[in-house]
């Protein structure tokens, strides 16, 4: 039987991870290990200065007082009964497109799975007042089945974004590149009840590159977006340019 490790960054009680676990349980043995709270924006952070405490829940899930990356690392290295065949992260409440991927704990959980040597997928549902986790779960299951049957290169994860639409209104799947956003909106400056100064980070910037071929464009036109991501951040096309620059200094 196929074994799949499921995690997320919205927390172990989020509706997305429940929908994902139930959908994947139809094709695999699923182990669900996720943060005990919302860790959105945690990126690839690890907890190195405190112990990781876990709680085994009545529904079989395991919550971890740690980040999404902690969850996947701990699950694979210690908690899983045998290695998983795949790591699937999500379903995130909100898209992870363009620059979002740099900050996303959802994407980071998948990246950690790939870093440890396993095929990995991150899946997110675009929108705010989300209604259609079932649509995202169905596409997640379909894509996971395809990935198991036809593996991709070992240095990649698949970043999937699904429009918040009924299943029969989604037009299909498009392979995309990452788009881009304008810089984030301003900081909100205010005071807490005790009169102390506090700050809230503003919402993400609007789309800057949402042209055809991007994840933003696919979602806006009712398609599921799949973008292959690599862990290697090296800007290979700039190596020779940088070498020329170094030779001049």
From Swiss-Prot:
Keywords: Cytoplasm, Hydrolase, Metal-binding, Nucleotide-binding. This is 5'-nucleotidase SurE. Its EC number is 3.1.3.5. Binds 1 divalent metal cation per subunit. It is an enzyme of class 3 (hydrolase). Pfam families: SurE. Its main location: cytoplasm. Belongs to the SurE nucleotidase family. It comes from the Bacteria. A divalent metal cation binds at residues 9-10, 40, 92. One of its GO terms (molecular function) is 3'-nucleotidase activity. Nucleotidase that shows phosphatase activity on nucleoside 5'-monophosphates. GO terms for cellular component: cytoplasm. The gene is surE. It is found in: Cytoplasm. The lineage of its organism: Bacteria, Pseudomonadati, Pseudomonadota, Gammaproteobacteria, Alteromonadales. Its cofactor is a divalent metal cation.
